[in-house]
């Protein structure tokens, strides 16, 4: 047996529809498309989202907000993630090296979430008020 000799068991698959081969076949003349109308024509089909003249869903729902393009370049860092960085200084490069943020991130903000158990110096990152207090309470400092 070879790959080009593989075939399904006889009778296991229905034979293909042979359209337009005489009226006795049941699929002759109009070929299963009915009479006239958009869907009987070649290349004729309704546009995606068309609901037969009813107001489409996309137009029934209100417009709402927008997606910020800058969002993909800004990261949020929790306090417990700062502890994963090796060394005392935490900046963008150190966060990327520790695999905490993606390579394309341009700016990051430290937020008060989790706990910080060692002193670190945060450089060049934005820091929330609560996170700033937590960093200084742990013996670290924030440099802008």
From Swiss-Prot:
Gene3D superfamilies: 3.100.10.10. Residues 21-31 have a biased composition (Gly residues). One of its GO terms (biological process) is translation. InterPro entries: Ribosomal_uL15 (IPR030878), Ribosomal_uL15/eL18 (IPR021131), Ribosomal_uL15/eL18_sf (IPR036227), Ribosomal_uL15_bac-type (IPR005749), Ribosomal_uL15_CS (IPR001196). GO terms for molecular function: rRNA binding; structural constituent of ribosome. Residues 1-58 are annotated as: Disordered. This is Large ribosomal subunit protein uL15. Part of the 50S ribosomal subunit. It comes from Marinobacter nauticus (strain ATCC 700491 / DSM 11845 / VT8) (Marinobacter aquaeolei). Pfam families: Ribosomal_L27A (PF00828). The gene is rplO. Binds to the 23S rRNA. SUPFAM superfamilies: Ribosomal proteins L15p and L18e. The keyword tRNA processing does not apply. GO terms for cellular component: cytosolic large ribosomal subunit. It comes from the Bacteria. Keywords: Ribonucleoprotein, Ribosomal protein, RNA-binding, rRNA-binding. Belongs to the universal ribosomal protein uL15 family.
């Amino acid at each position: 047996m070879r790959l080009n000799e593989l075939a399904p068991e006889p009778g296991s698959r229905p034979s293909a529809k042979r359209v337009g081969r005489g009226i006795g076949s049941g699929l002759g003349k109009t070929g299963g498309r009915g009479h006239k109308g958009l869907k009987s024509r070649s290349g004729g089909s309704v546009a995606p989202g068309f609901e037969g003249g009813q107001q489409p869903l996309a137009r029934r729902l209100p417009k709402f907000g927008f997606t910020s393009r800058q969002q993909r370049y800004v990261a949020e860092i929790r306090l417990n993630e700062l502890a994963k960085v090796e060394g005392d200084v935490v900046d963008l490069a150190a966060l990327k090296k520790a695999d905490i943020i993606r390579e394309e991130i341009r700016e990051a903000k430290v937020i008060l979430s989790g706990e910080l158990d060692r002193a670190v110096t945060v450089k060049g990152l934005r820091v929330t008020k609560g996170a700033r207090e937590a960093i200084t309470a742990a013996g670290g400092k924030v440099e802008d």
